[in-house]
């Protein structure tokens, strides 16, 4: 077998949903199909998903890959079988720990590990910090999303590995999310006059949104993402924009808490929890929205941060103004006051104020989305 080939080792791969999964899949798609092999964990619905891809995907029976001897041996075997001379760890921690053995047993000559937000936790936790340093020693390059995550990770890696760090930030295909000028207004007009809705109104039809102003948050349902802050802000939003609705897409352990919070806050009728949606459906969700908001916040004394937030980039590509929480690398996705607003994700009043301004002045909001 000739030519260079890369083994991608990752837990974060569709049909599992999330920003890292989107990032890893998009990066892998950019390899020539005959130059990449993916080794990833089991996931419901994976067989149909993988069959449609132009490159091989090998699923481990485990739901989570860990750098244990069995997994490392299988990765080494795949690298030998497919003639891989490089390995890319889609998330550095913890899988990058297998880089040394992969080199010894498979002929892999180059190893690259990508960091996101959770490696900041590793960098600031003593035991995990030592393991992160080991990953830096065993790989040729560790990538980072932006300055906010680089600083703590570089300090943990040590001087030599820090000098080899390379920025690798996600991007999106603007054409995949572009909304035709005037399409949102046309959708709202059709909903008002009862005419048959067009293609971009299917999301509004599905959730019974009609012509209501829609605040969209697309994220895993966990406290860091700030869906609870959006729900707490809704009473103030509804006093100024009575027909507004909050559309939450995503799965996660916080779903039951959010439903209860919406009921206790008296805004259950204005909150739609849509569950996880396949990524190919997301352009229509963005097209159905008027504002995108994810007031993410740093938690656990700085251990838990937002790495970047690819959803902010997708929303911007769809022409939406974005409301961004000031956690980790998320501020890199917005020009405050130009393409949206940067807020303290813990400040419910500030979140409500910015949402009201965006929903009431649609011309200004649309101008932000166009920048």
Label every model-predicted segment:
Residues 293, 312, 317, 321-324, ...:
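Short hydrophobic beta-strand element within catalytic cores of glycosyltransferases
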Residues 256-281, 291:
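Nucleotide-activated donor-binding/catalytic signature segment of Leloir-type glycosyltransferases, i.e.
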Residues 89-95:
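Short His-centered aromatic/hydrophobic patch
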Residues 326, 333-337, 341-349, 356-363:
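Conserved acidic donor-binding segment of nucleotide-sugar-dependent glycosyltransferases
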Residues 243, 270, 350, 357, ...:
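A short, well-ordered alpha-helix in the C-terminal region of glycosyltransferases
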Residues 143, 185, 189-190, 209-225, ...:
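Conserved donor-binding/catalytic core segment of Leloir-type glycosyltransferases
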Residues 276, 287-305, 320:
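Acidic donor-binding loop of glycosyltransferase active sites
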Residues 148, 171:
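Carbohydrate-associated surface elements
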């Amino acid at each position: 077998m000739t030519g260079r080939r890369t083994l991608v080792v990752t837990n974060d791969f569709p049909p599992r949903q999330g920003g890292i999964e989107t990032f890893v899949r998009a990066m892998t798609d950019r390899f020539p199909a005959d130059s990449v092999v993916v080794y990833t964990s089991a996931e419901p619905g994976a067989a149909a998903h993988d069959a449609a891809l132009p490159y091989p995907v090998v699923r481990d029976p485990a739901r989570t890959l860990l750098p244990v001897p069995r997994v490392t041996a299988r990765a080494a075997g795949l690298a030998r079988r497919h003639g891989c001379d490089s390995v890319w760890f889609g998330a550095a921690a913890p899988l990058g720990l297998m880089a040394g053995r992969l080199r010894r047993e498979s002929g892999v000559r180059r190893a690259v590990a990508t960091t996101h937000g959770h490696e900041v936790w590793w960098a600031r936790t003593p035991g995990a910090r030592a393991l992160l340093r080991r990953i830096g020693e065993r790989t040729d390059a560790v990538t980072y999303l932006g300055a906010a995550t680089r600083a703590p990770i570089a300090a943990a890696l040590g001087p030599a590995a820090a000098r080899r760090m390379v920025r690798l930030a996600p991007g999106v295909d603007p054409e995949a999310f572009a909304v035709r000028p005037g399409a949102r207004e046309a959708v709202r007009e059709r909903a008002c006059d009862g005419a048959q809705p067009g293609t971009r109104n299917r999301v509004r039809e599905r959730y019974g949104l009609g012509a209501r102003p829609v605040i969209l948050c697309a994220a895993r349902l966990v406290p860091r993402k700030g869906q609870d802050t959006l729900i707490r802000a809704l009473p103030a939003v509804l006093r100024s924009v009575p027909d507004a609705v909050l559309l939450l897409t995503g799965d996660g352990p916080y779903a039951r808490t959010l439903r209860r919070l919406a009921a206790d806050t008296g805004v259950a009728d204005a909150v739609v929890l849509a569950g996880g949606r396949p990524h190919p459906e997301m352009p229509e969700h963005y097209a159905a929205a008027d504002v995108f908001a994810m007031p993410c916040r740093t938690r656990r004394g700085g251990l838990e941060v937002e790495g970047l937030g690819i959803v902010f980039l997708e929303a911007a590509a769809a022409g939406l103004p974005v409301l961004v929480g000031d956690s980790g690398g998320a501020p890199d996705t917005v020009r405050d006051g130009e393409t949206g607003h940067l807020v303290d994700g813990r400040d419910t009043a500030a979140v409500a104020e910015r949402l009201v301004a965006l929903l009431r002045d649609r011309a200004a909001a649309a101008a932000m989305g166009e920048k």
